[in-house]
């Protein structure tokens, strides 16, 4: 009788490599699944490594464009920053990885899926809630959470089973990267008072070493979707990667954040998001030009909730779908070009234009070209201030001196 299959989210690192052998010992045939969401790894090597370690099959899926268009784009249009700082790098990729795990599990007739998360982080929640939403009949296995080994015990297990040990194992950092950015934790970063060492960064240049001349770029948007840089068209994934390089060269997008994790602890992390932060800033400026006041003032409430929902692993939820439906409605006229200066850690918007601009220079100007009806202000002020005036009249004699 054939062994039941389990589909493992495989990264090529020590944890998931050991997990292949461990799952085999539990009686499973392991199907490895590795997604390319822009992490910059040699994923063909990772695919082959899974087979060498013992997987019966290994999938390598190029999901960069799907990640960009279906996940990162929503974060961009929502200006999604958890606690006002974190651009949801890992939180955005987990639902897509979960989706692919479920798709392969159904294709392979697997009874379970597995991930390499510990019992301490947010990702275990994001994976398992997403998988439950997509296929409640699949069992979810978390080997690292179950085996409770120390790092030394895990390395010894790997040696005993001839599992290749990654050459970067001595690195003190825990890193996750995709198109939208790079997150880094552990090691010296666990001390919130310690300055991050320069080796903690990879996508961005230290301010001391950035160019002394700025780069001026123009980003073109169509209905809220970035399409061009300096007039040249790119796919969304390519555009984000281009901006990572352009803005990263100038040190844009470094974030040092102590955040409140979903599991109840605080965590200090360092993020690099040069492309994401540049796009969010440019997109917000174009919205300021094209959205009516009421929508512009209400949208940040939706944005904050979307960030929380994504961070908490509720991507496949009715609430997220409803929030995104509102978000998409706001993007119909967010078309135009934004000029950005990249210099010494800053993405500075210096100009914006749109065929749907609600800015009327003849109404805004203080020159002789002014077309604003100044006399209309008299009646407006009278009506606008009427509630305050009435309150003052009614309560004027009741005021108490302090």
Curated annotation (Swiss-Prot):
Q: Name one Pfam family in it.
A: Arginosuc_synth
- NCBIfam families assigned: argG, PRK00509.1
* Name by which UniProt lists this protein: Argininosuccinate synthase
Write out the transmembrane intervals. Answer: none
Q: Which residues bind ATP?
A: 9-17, 116
Keyword Nucleotide-binding belongs to the record: yes
Q: What positions does the entry give for L-citrulline binding? A: 86, 122, 126, 174, 183, 259, 271
Q: Name one GO cellular component term.
A: cytoplasm
What family, per the record?
Answer: Belongs to the argininosuccinate synthase family. Type 1 subfamily.
Q: Could you tell me which pathway this protein works in?
A: Amino-acid biosynthesis; L-arginine biosynthesis; L-arginine from L-ornithine and carbamoyl phosphate: step 2/3
The organism's lineage? Bacteria, Bacillati, Bacillota, Bacilli, Bacillales
Q: Which InterPro entries match?
A: Arginosuc_syn_C, Arginosuc_syn_N, Arginosuc_synth, Arginosuc_synth_CS, Arginosuc_synth_type_1_subfam, AS_cat/multimer_dom_body, Rossmann-like_a/b/a_fold
Coiled-coil region(s) at which residues? none
Cellular location(s): Cytoplasm
| Source organism | Anoxybacillus flavithermus (strain DSM 21510 / WK1)
* One function term, GO molecular function aspect: argininosuccinate synthase activity
- What EC number(s) are associated with this protein in UniProt? 6.3.4.5
- Catalyzed reactions per annotation: L-citrulline + L-aspartate + ATP = 2-(N(omega)-L-arginino)succinate + AMP + diphosphate + H(+)
Enumerate the UniProt keywords alphabetically. Answer: Amino-acid biosynthesis, Arginine biosynthesis, ATP-binding, Cytoplasm, Ligase, Nucleotide-binding
